[in-house]
Structure formats: C-alpha cells, structure tokens
Amino acid sequence: MTVSSHRLELLSPARDAAIAREAILHGADAVYIGGPGFGARHNASNSLKDIAELVPFAHRYGAKIFVTLNTILHDDELEPAQRLITDLYQTGVDALIVQDMGILELDIPPIELHASTQCDIRTVEKAKFLSDVGFTQIVLARELNLDQIRAIHQATDATIEFFIHGALCVAYSGQCYISHAQTGRSANRGDCSQACRLPYTLKDDQGRVVSYEKHLLSMKDNDQTANLGALIDAGVRSFKIEGRYKDMSYVKNITAHYRQMLDAIIEERGDLARASSGRTEHFFVPSTEKTFHRGSTDYFVNARKGDIGAFDSPKFIGLPVGEVVKVAKDHLDVAVTEPLANGDGLNVLIKREVVGFRANTVEKTGENQYRVWPNEMPADLHKIRPHHPLNRNLDHNWQQALTKTSSERRVAVDIELGGWQEQLILTLTSEEGVSITHTLDGQFDEANNAEKAMNNLKDGLAKLGQTLYYARDVQINLPGALFVPNSLLNQFRREAADMLDAARLASYQRGSRKPVADPAPVYPQTHLSFLANVYNQKAREFYHRYGVQLIDAAYEAHEEKGEVPVMITKHCLRFAFNLCPKQAKGNIKSWKATPMQLVNGDEVLTLKFDCRPCEMHVIGKIKNHILKMPLPGSVVASVSPDELLKTLPKRKG
C-alpha cells in the first residue's frame, strides 16, 4: 500500500522485536527488521515467531512492518528464500525490502515489494523501471541531490524513500566489493568487513604522501534535520533512519528526534499528515549528538562539500565538555561547561586516537571545576598537557532516562454514551474512523445529584489509561442524568475498548504486490556488468525478460579475477584535499586527475577519478585464496570443515 501523497512515513530500524516496539512507541510510522535469513545485516536476524507477535502490535497503531530480504542469493538459496517469503506473508508483515531481482521470478505470495538501497537507484530510468516491474516503494541512493530526487519523484508513481540519518556507506550502496575482495565477506550478502573504517595513507602519482594514516574512506554520519522540508517538497514521503545494528537508546533517541521534527512540519503546513495513528509524548529531550555519531553531514543533498569525511577517527567522541587542567596518578582535574556525573563516558584525542574512560566518581571542587576518578586510568592521559580538550560521549543521567519508560503513544477516540434507563449504548470511534457500538442492559435510574452523575459518567468513560487510547471527546446523550455504578461502567468501557481493538485490527488493510505495467517495461541497458550483482539463474531470467541481452556474473561468483573497481563512490579524495582539477585556478589549472594510491599495511588500492560524473573508483583485485573458497551461499559453502573432511577419499591399506 503506497504512502498517500500527503502522508509522511517515519521509518525506523530495529535489530530485534523489542527495539521495534520501542521505535513504534517513540513515533515510528513503520519499522524495518531482519527476518530469519537473507537480510543485509549478518547479526540482526529475528525468528518468525517474534515477527508474528510484532505485527499486530504495530498494526494497532497503524504502523507497518517491513522485513529486509535484501542480500543477493545463490541458486541454492532460492527455494529456502521462497519458503521464507511465504512464511513471512502469513505472519502479516506489510512488505519485503529486496535487492535480488530473482525474487520477482519466484512463486511467492502477493506481498508488497520495496526496492532496497542496495539496488543503487540513481537515475530516473532505473527508478521508473523498478516502479513499472512491481515495486511500490524505492529507496534512492544517498548521494542524490534535491533536483535529482525531484526528477525521480515526478517520473514515477512509486513512493520515494530516502535515508535521513545514520551511518553513511562511502560507496554507492550495492557497488562495494572491497570487503569480499580482501576477506571473502560480501557486503551484498550482509557481511561487510568495513574496510572503509580503516586508516589509510594517501599517495599521489609520484609516490608522495598527501595524507598519513587517516580514515580516508570513513564518512561522517548523515543528518538531514535541516533539509526535511526541502526533501518533502522534492517528493520524499518515507524518511528512513539507518541503524539495524544500533542499540535501544539510539533508536529511541533518533526516532523521537525526527518524530518531533516531522510533527512540527505537519502542524505548520496543514496539507500533510503522519502515515500512522496516534500522538507521541516523549519523557526526555532528544539529541542527535548524545548517541553514537561520527560528526554530521547532509552529504550531497544540497551541494558537494569538502568536509563530509570523519578522517581523524571513525569512533564516537561525543560533545566538547571542557578541558583537562591536570592529570594525577589516579585522577584528573577538569574545567567544564556542563555538570558531570558518576558514570559519564569521557575522552580526549591524542594524535587522532580516542583515549576514553568511564568516570567512576566525580567530585565538584569549585565553580565549573571537577575532580574525576576513572574506573581505569589510561596511561596515555599522562601524555597530555594542561588545557587539553575534553569530550563526553556518554551522558550517564541522560542515558538513564532512556532505560526507563521514555515515551507514550496513544490513539484518539471519540466516545458517545446514549440509550435509556433499560439499556446503555456506548459508541467508540477511533481517529481513523473505525467505530464500534456496545450495549449494557439493566435498570439505570435517574441520579439524585444530576451534575455529579454526569461528571462521573464523563470521567469514568474517559479513563483509558490501561489501553492505547485517549479520549478526544466525550458526549453524553441520555434522557437524563442516570446513575451507573462505577464497577459496571468500568467493565462496560473495558469491553468496548477491547471491541475497538479487534475492529481496528480487522479493518487494517495491508498492501499487495503492484502489477507489472502494460506494456511491460524495458530495462535501460542491454549489457549488465558485475556491478548489477546478478548471482542466480532467476535474476538472469528476470533481466532477459525485460530486454537485457548480455549479463555478467556478480563479483561474488569469482569470475572477475583481475583489477576492477571494488568500490565506486561520490566521495572524492582529490576534492577533499583541494587537488580537484575542476577547482584548480591560476598556475595549477593544468592539473590532471591522475591516479593516486591508498595504502593500509600490505594492501595497496589504486584510485581513479571519473570527473564527468564526479566519482572516485577504488581499484583492487580479489585475493587468490578467496578465489579458491566455495561460492557464498552455495551448498558447499554451508558445509562445515569437519563435514568436508569426511568427503575426502579414504586411503587404501
């Protein structure tokens, strides 16, 4: 079911069902979560039972559950994937997020399909094709700007989904093979080794060092807080938070932050609405800077910028909180701009390395002065000089608020009590317009104190604290002020609320798979390289069906044995270090975008620069020992080493 043109969907990540529930309570309109297998986060899977229990919880708030099945599949995995999709459909999930086009060739139920960010959707032509072959919602590449997003929105009827917060893959999603080339672990199969977070030395074409031992492929975190209104105007309707590995506190905090931001826009503009039901109240002040982040960037949404990288450290250093005045044997004295608390996480940067410690005890020694005793005193602290900057990456008191009940979400209900002395008629109508009527037979005489009786009825009917509802309006339409015992009224109200629960769940309509356009679309290319990630026969059949003539195998098939782009990225190190020919002026205008090198230990990667689309290609070669490994996902690859030994021929004699 596509998001209505005026409804905005806040889409939150969930590592598990418990986090998914909290995401919904903190304001998510939809949650994406891994199933028992084939999701692009290797250690974020959930059982069918957990998902089946999560679905009705979400649907009671009008929220949706999307399950990620967004790895590329080996032929051996197609049948298990087909069974899993059928099982997921039976649990009631709203949609699958997929990358592998082979899934569209399987015999699966009519479940709604969303195109994963791994599909690398950057062009109008590709977006329109995916919409026309049956995808209801498409996740655009993070690297797009507002004009590109708007053009795609105007050319397709698919709901536009866009990442607004969280970690950034330096490569175009689905176009990174460096992990598989170096370790055999495939990002396209949910097992990225995160080579982009390692330190590298950058050398020019003469071998001269441009930058030494910095995290040159590590990006700051995405933060589109300031661009939400512009993204809405460009056509984005699903606002996605990255983070299926993130903990409960992170998801609570970031979901609450964007819930408040979107609600403010909805209230201000009047022509927009949230995509699910209820109002959300938070019992803490959200802050994007108090949970994990590597610094913030809005990436390419407005224009290319030079400060998108987190080159010094891929770790979370938090917010500046003061400076170190003195370091003693077992403690340090600090001057701060904010109060400290026992349990705070503090750190300093020493030669670009984060030296962190937990404050076991803090003691105020003067105005804005504290003495801090760490749990363990890092030896490197003794290297720093007075007035060294101090950061806090764990605010203990703020975090404690998140470990408790930190949000409440309730759905509005209009209540009307009618009837007469022999029968009461109670009607509950939810904010979505679902209505139930419940009756209570008896003999209800007129009360001695009419005003008190009417107030008791109104107050009693509005007591919805143990439910997910709140009374938006209470109307009493009786022939007089009738006396109804509190015990009867409470039971009457509880039964009606249960009936409304059931009616709202019964009325929930989930979407279904979108039909293929007529006439059938044609894929915009006739030749697909390994970059298309075609890893199984069904995916080949899909692309052949839509006009592709020549299809190369996915990188994981080990047919690309030479040097190829193992990463394609919009991030450009020439631009970052003011070596871009497009930016050159005066005497250096003759610069050319000659290749450069990234060096990490024995690993040497060549950088080539394609200046027309403004991209950097990281060139590498798959290691020989990986070529000898079984193909990922194959039956052979799933056999344990002990089992493989059993298959060896027995020695004679």
Swiss-Prot record:
InterPro entries: Pept_U32_collagenase, Peptidase_U32, RNA/ubiquinone_mod_enzymes. Disruption phenotype: Deletion of the gene results in complete loss of the ho5C2501 modification. One of its GO terms (biological process) is rRNA modification. The keyword rRNA processing applies. Changing C176A: Loss of activity. Changing Q175A: No change in activity. Keywords: rRNA processing. Iron-sulfur clusters and prephenate are required for ho5C2501 formation. Changing C580A: Loss of activity. It comes from the Bacteria. Responsible for the formation of the 5-hydroxycytidine modification at the C2501 position (ho5C2501) of 23S rRNA. May be a Fe-S protein that catalyzes ho5C2501 formation using prephenate as a hydroxyl group donor. Interacts with precursors of the 50S ribosomal subunit. Belongs to the peptidase U32 family. This is 23S rRNA 5-hydroxycytidine C2501 synthase. It comes from Escherichia coli (strain K12).
